[in-house]
Amino acid sequence: MTDAQIRSLIGRPPASGAWREGDPVADRLFASVGGVDLEAGGRIPSVRVAYETFGERDPDGGNAVLVLHALTGDSHLRGPAGPGQPTGGWWSGIVGPGLAIDTDRWFVVAPNMLGGCQGTTGPASLAPDGAEWGARFPFITIRDQVAVQAALADALGIDVWAAVVGGSMGGMQALEWGVGLPGRMRRLAILAAPAIASADQIALNSVQAEAIRMDPAYRDGDYFDAADGDGPHRGLALARRMALLNYRSPDELNQRFSRSWQSGISPMGDEGRYAVESYLDFHGNKFTRRFDATSYIRLIDAMSSHDVGRDRGGVEAALASVRAATLVVGIDSDRLFPVPDQRLVARHVPGSVDGGEVVVISSDYGHDGFLIENEAVGRALARLLDTPA
């Protein structure tokens, strides 16, 4: 662990790592998009979306590209961390001048998703009664999140996106755009995402949510007034540790850590630990300083709800409604959303730019390969964006 990493963990974790009203705005822009009626019932009476933009918009808006983040991402595609922005840009090697999504050519819009905790309305936001929503924040689905993104597009005056791009949970949303709003994009990129959440994926999500709920400090979601160190950081960190095991591959963990000891102290007793355990601890602890526990629960519940075929005649029928030129990318070592998940999509969308095949990227990094393998991912995205549509 580096000195910089150690400094980032000094002090007790906050009750919630969410961006809160009054925090530095950083590069966020905000749009109020009104209320949203939810697929599972209920209504959020007022939704505000935090988003960032990159590049210049053409007068006719024809160069607008929507980029959708993964479960624990945010609107900060590129740029440094700083006050109000706990992490650096998560796709700085893909989005920017001269890069695959070239901001000298494209106007990129990146929103924080509904239910998130970096500026868009979610559990850490204030409800109409002036208190945090907490666990009162209603159950939401991928379709609800896309409805809010579509409302943002309306507010920005963007009728048709040049492309909608998403990876992981963002890829679920991008596919829902293609199925549910087929006339609103010309190109579509689905990276490391399925058309439907499997039983295996739902099971993984459920144990993460339970880890948070079993933390006594969770207090049924009513923890926002807790002092630093007294919030549900243990449960949230444990959920993050569970998730990391599916974000990375066995080969990478074995190559990086093998059976090495942390700090040279033998783990064959009560004092020492394996280095891989320390790695998980570090990332769990770090995560609690930038995320909210109830937001995490609501978002993984939304992932589990994902099924583009629900009430549409099944998955294959739903995929057949996609009209955009479509790129589907998978990672060969992905054990969260393995390549067969992407093959189902590629074979049934009519506009596949690869003849119904998946672009399979070889990577030791598992699911996170779509965030790390910039050269291969960038090459595929650039090809899609150069496709006439």
Swiss-Prot record:
Record-annotated AB hydrolase-1 domain positions: 63-371
Source species taxonomy: Bacteria, Bacillati, Actinomycetota, Actinomycetes, Micrococcales
GO cellular component: cytoplasm
UniProt cross-references to InterPro entries, sorted A to Z: AB_hydrolase_1 (IPR000073), AB_hydrolase_fold (IPR029058), HAT_MetX-like (IPR008220)
Assigned EC number: 2.3.1.31
Similarity field: Belongs to the AB hydrolase superfamily. MetX family.
GO aspect biological process, one term: homoserine metabolic process
Keywords: Acyltransferase, Amino-acid biosynthesis, Cytoplasm, Methionine biosynthesis, Transferase
A GO molecular-function annotation: homoserine O-acetyltransferase activity
SUPFAM superfamilies cross-referenced by the UniProt entry: alpha/beta-Hydrolases
Quaternary structure and interacting proteins, as annotated: Homodimer.
Protein name (Swiss-Prot/TrEMBL): Homoserine O-acetyltransferase
One Pfam match: Abhydrolase_1
UniProt pathway annotation: Amino-acid biosynthesis; L-methionine biosynthesis via de novo pathway; O-acetyl-L-homoserine from L-homoserine: step 1/1
Superkingdom, taxonomy of origin: Bacteria
Class in the EC hierarchy, top level: transferase
NCBIfam families: homoserO_Ac_trn, PRK00175.1
Gene that this polypeptide is encoded by: metXA
Function: Transfers an acetyl group from acetyl-CoA to L-homoserine, forming acetyl-L-homoserine.
PANTHER family: HOMOSERINE O-ACETYLTRANSFERASE
